[in-house]
């Protein structure tokens, strides 16, 4: 082994395996583009995004870490969300939760 070498397991790595997912239709009703990062609590995104916020509580985008989805003005698109993991406590963002989900 070489120092720092990574030896991955054989096969594909499935992101967020075994976690609950949800598919929602989202529309940017604003006049500016809105970008949402991979780990942002989706229910607390920009108010110009129209979707079922109650259903999205406790979920984030089901995309690779460090990436984002951009919603152009007037654009409607379908997104897949994945349940937050760990202690399921949310702090910050828009301050709507500030604790356990």
Swiss-Prot record:
Enzyme class label: hydrolase
Cytoplasm recorded as keyword: yes
Reactions it catalyzes: urea + 2 H2O + H(+) = hydrogencarbonate + 2 NH4(+)
Keyword Cell division appears in the UniProt entry: no
Lineage: superkingdom: Bacteria
GO MF terms held by the record: urease activity
Pathway assigned in UniProt: Nitrogen metabolism; urea degradation; CO(2) and NH(3) from urea (urease route): step 1/1
Gene3D superfamilies given in the database record: Urease, beta subunit (2.10.150.10)
Xref: InterPro entries: Urease_beta-like, Urease_betasu_sf, Urease_subunit
Main location: cytoplasm
Compartment(s): Cytoplasm
HAMAP family for the chain: Urease_beta
Binding partners and assembly: Heterotrimer of UreA (gamma), UreB (beta) and UreC (alpha) subunits. Three heterotrimers associate to form the active enzyme.
Family membership: Belongs to the urease beta subunit family.
UniProt protein name: Urease subunit beta
Organism per entry: Azoarcus sp. (strain BH72)
Organism lineage: Bacteria, Pseudomonadati, Pseudomonadota, Betaproteobacteria, Rhodocyclales
Gene (UniProt): ureB
């Amino acid at each position: 082994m070489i120092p720092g070498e990574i030896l991955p397991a054989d096969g594909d790595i499935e992101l967020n395996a075994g976690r609950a997912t949800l598919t929602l239709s989202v529309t940017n009703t604003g006049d500016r583009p809105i970008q949402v990062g991979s780990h942002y609590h989706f229910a607390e995104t920009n108010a110009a995004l129209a979707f079922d916020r109650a259903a999205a509580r406790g979920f984030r985008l089901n995309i690779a870490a460090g990436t984002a989805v951009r919603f152009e003005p007037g654009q409607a698109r379908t997104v897949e969300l994945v349940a937050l993991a760990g202690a399921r406590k949310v702090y910050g963002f828009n301050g709507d939760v500030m604790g356990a989900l």
